[in-house]
Amino acid sequence: RWLDYTIYLCKSNDELYTLIHQRTEQDIWKHLYEFVLNEYDNEEQWLAAATSHSSIATTHILSHQRLHARFTIRKVDILPVIPDTICIRWSELDQYALSRLTLKVLERFGGLI
């Protein structure tokens, strides 16, 4: 699977905000929260969707499949309206259940956010 996550960041009144949504698909990540996701059928599509924004690409191995994931930071003046997402304070992100893949990538971003 080829996953492309976008971490939208918007600063307002000295607070940083982002968008997340809760997964409802019947898989191991059901009920976990994640950033805005686009999924691609193959590597060519995934590579073609790359942007010049700060990003981290990684491979995550599950027991039954290999996930190729890219997380891209997009700093915006206004958060986009995206169905099924919620706007939260970045400082409250730890109150939401995230996948191990997402947590590991956030650690790698470190001071970029």
Give short role names for the model-derived ranges.
Residues 1-113:
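Intrinsically disordered, low-complexity, charged terminal extensions of DNA damage-control enzymes
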